[in-house]
Amino acid sequence: MNIAKLIDHTVLKPNSKKEDVMKVIEEAKKYNFASVCINPTWVKLAAEELAGHDVDVCTVIGFPLGANTTETKVFETKDVIAKGATEVDMVINVGALKDGDDEFVEKDIREVVQAAKGKALVKVIIETCLLTDEEKVRACELSVKAGADFVKTSTGFSTGGATAEDIALMRKTVGPNVGVKASGGVRTREDAEKMIEAGASRIGASASVAIVLNDEKGATDNY
């Protein structure tokens, strides 16, 4: 298994400097990760640096709270795609989901999906640590209904990250044709393999190099 091609090599800390982002880009070239996942302000740089390399440019929308308006999320999506993003990880409106406003949640996702159509993959972050199992299932069902390419566990900025149990539940809910991304707290090769075994088709990690090299020390970041 080429585990590197399942990893979004991630740097999303608010205090990340250009040198931190460049380090991630260079590592992505070296190890041929699926993508680099960076904050929107770095998308143009990453797209320029990764031109000609088989590494996608992934960024985040409505991040990390998901509480932006739909119009803002749509604007962000169009803006980052224009700057070179080929994958976007959007955060759902968690409060609306908890209120049972499924129509709003689906519309919020669908409008981002439509803004990205044919230009970028859309991964929907449901923030599993804040949800009941019933809400996790509902969030996944609404994501599929809205046309998302992936569902994703976590931002890495809330109270918890990916668990194998959540991945299994998400995979069971979305079926075989929608991706499932495990993110938050995946720090070692063993962590990554557990997630893949449970049904993950993508891993979000900042410890990507340690995972590929099977370096047990891993990393300490939540993401």
Swiss-Prot record:
Q: In the Enzyme Commission scheme, what number(s) does this protein have?
A: 4.1.2.4
Q: Which gene encodes it?
A: deoC
Its annotated function is as follows:
Catalyzes a reversible aldol reaction between acetaldehyde and D-glyceraldehyde 3-phosphate to generate 2-deoxy-D-ribose 5-phosphate.
Query: Which keywords describe this protein according to UniProt?
Result: Cytoplasm, Lyase, Schiff base
What is the protein's species of origin? Bacillus cytotoxicus (strain DSM 22905 / CIP 110041 / 391-98 / NVH 391-98)
Answer yes or no on keyword RNA-binding: no
One Pfam short name? DeoC
Q: What protein am I looking at? A: Deoxyribose-phosphate aldolase
Catalytic residue positions:
D89, K152, K181
Gene Ontology terms describing biological process: 2-deoxyribose 1-phosphate catabolic process; carbohydrate catabolic process; deoxyribonucleotide catabolic process
Say which enzyme class the record assigns: lyase
What family classification does the UniProt entry report for this protein? Belongs to the DeoC/FbaB aldolase family. DeoC type 1 subfamily.
Keyword Cytoplasm assigned to the entry: answer is yes
Q: Report the catalytic activity.
A: 2-deoxy-D-ribose 5-phosphate = D-glyceraldehyde 3-phosphate + acetaldehyde
